[in-house]
Amino acid sequence: MKIEGSDQLGGEQPQRQPLPPESMAQRQLERLLAKAPESDLFERWQQGAPLEGLLAVVAPAAKRELLWQIYQQGNKPAPEIGKQLFAPVTDKLIARFGERQSPVLDAIDLPELRATMREFDPLASRREKVLLNLLSELRDGQGAVPAEHLFLDALARRELMTLIPLNGMVDNLMRNSHKLDLEA
């Protein structure tokens, strides 16, 4: 017996479609949640645990996260922490872009810079701090940029022209999203 609108015979059950595979993002989230014991590192550091001991037993991503939390507190060890955070990125950027010649080609150079920066940290606000630190390190004693680093200086400035307004908008959204804009 055939039912209208169906190509199936009456006694057969329609075949079930296989469920779509789990999304990659969902699997990554589950993996990150499974590694949650590292989330109390900052509290343990505040309670007096030695920083070297905490950093010795965790994954590189957790190390970086703990160092950023300590750096953002602005306490006494912040300059040493800043060196640990900024030195690897600065060294890689200087090695990769230090000897290139101007002009900066936005379509080629900026995506390469962004990809290099994302290897170290995906957050735009942290990349902004790293680039500002890079600009200060590129300057010599008189405040001038050496000729071999002019390209990297221009490239970092171009990226900061994007990052600073972007981070400002995100900051405004986070701070003022609960307020109504009645003037608009």
Curated annotation (Swiss-Prot):
* Keyword annotations of the record: Plasmid, Secreted, Virulence
Its subcellular locations are: Secreted
Instruction: Explain the induction of this protein.
Output: Part of a gene cluster encoding T3SS structural components.
Q: Which InterPro entries match?
A: T3SS_YopR (IPR013349), YopR_core (IPR041814)
Swiss-Prot/TrEMBL GO biological process terms: protein secretion by the type III secretion system
Q: Where is this region: Disordered?
A: 1-25
Q: Name one GO cellular component term.
A: extracellular region
User: Pfam families of this UniProt entry?
Assistant: T3SS_needle_reg (PF09025)
Protein origin, superkingdom = Bacteria
- For this UniProt entry, what is the primary localization, expressed as one broad class? secreted
Functional note = May be involved in the regulation of the assembly of the type III secretion system (T3SS), also called injectisome, which is used to inject bacterial effector proteins into eukaryotic host cells. May control the polymerization of the needle.
What family is it from?
Answer: Belongs to the YopR family.
What's the name of the protein?
A: Probable type 3 secretion system regulator AscH
Annotated source species: Aeromonas salmonicida subsp. salmonicida
